[in-house]
Amino acid sequence: MPRLSRRVLLALASAALLAAATLAAQTGSGNVQGRLIDEHGSPIVGGTVTLQGSTAPQRTGSDAQGHFRFLQVLPGTYSVTAAAPGFAAATREGVLVSVGRLTALEILLRISDVNEELTVSGETPLIDPGRVATGQTFAREQLTEIPTARDVWALVQQVPGIQLDTVNVAGNASATLGGPSFSNRGSGNVAYAIEGATITDSYYGFALNRQNGGTSIFFDYGTFEDVEVVTGGSSLDQQNSGATLNVVTKRGTNTLKGSARFLYASANWQSDNTPESSSANGLQTNSTRFIREYGGELGGPLIADRLWLWAAGARQDISLSPTTFSETEVPVPETATLEPWSAKLNAQISSPNSLALFYQRSDRSQYGTEVGPKRPPETRVNLLVPSDFYKIEDSYVFASDLFATVFGAYQKPRFQSLPVGGLDRDIEYYGDQYHQTYFYKASQQPQWQGNLHVSK
């Protein structure tokens, strides 16, 4: 009897795990689903459907109801070609696949005695009828057109219901965690993910005097393929009750291609709206001295249709003049450097099996920061925040309506706040201000995670 009970408990636990995994939806891919019909609206059975993008083509067939489905499709723009005996082939161009979403299609095949093909160009449906979650997805094309700072925090501010506690003017606060909150419930209810793996670091938010919630990884805006922000109706695997930000980076394709960029903003390009009364007293408001960013990416095939590599790197330098809080105070420049590096290796092991390896290194250095009304320049600190992130993911499509994905990820965030005044001086507090030096903070919190995702 005890042995039977253990078996029953094991079976129930396995079923619970499978059910939870089935509901998981925080991934780095989407699905394509459709139906083949003839001119009378009847389903076409046994048709061949091909999904063609920038990597290896995928093929499937239509069932007794004319339905077809492609699972675990990476974000991007594709063409879908359908063919069946006795019908003219038809191609749907410009099919957009977004992370975490289902793209629905209906393809009409016309009866034909000759070998011909019809190409249809049109907009991909923007509404997923089977999607419960609410939020917004930004595709690569949108990311280049939205007039915001090149910063993920400024991007998520475009989503209704999300607010930031930091004003980011043209990227002058890109080195600062934006502190996004959802529905005015504090920054602790926003979670972060990259390639579907959670990167929320509760200590990092706490160390910056924010509520729990933050991330020590700073993103390279130029590497985004898709950014998904989920604000409601989330799956059970979401680890908070608020919003979730999921970033999917680019990848190598069958075409060797790359890009480079250089961006610069100068203090001479800014206007000054400081009141004359304040200027006459010698007070200075915060301003941007300069913002400089350069970076590049390169990706392509190692083995066509089988193995692809993509890598990117960037550096952003930000220099600010902080606000002065007395007539005699001389503003000390605050500088920051962000250096994110990324690499992704994708492999098509077999037709149903794919493998992805991802690595990102994020180095953030901020010097002379945290000056404020109670923090004169002598209490400035230097922030050093290096972080490494590794992920391996394997996906297998068992049938047109069943696939599984398993991944493991490791994150090693470090945080160090070094007072400019040194560690050998006492912290004094008088006149409603700190003096001489400030507190030293340090943290290192390695994090492991794994996930099994089964969907039908």
Regions found by a protein language model. Give the residues of each.
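Extracytoplasmic loops and strand-loop junctions of Gram-negative outer membrane beta-barrel proteins
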Residues: 208-213, 228-230, 276-282, 324-329, ...
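Transmembrane beta-barrel wall of Gram-negative outer-membrane proteins
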Residues: 257, 286-365, 383-405
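Outer-membrane beta-barrel translocator domains and adjoining extracellular loop/strand segments
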Residues: 95, 207, 270-277, 321-329, ...
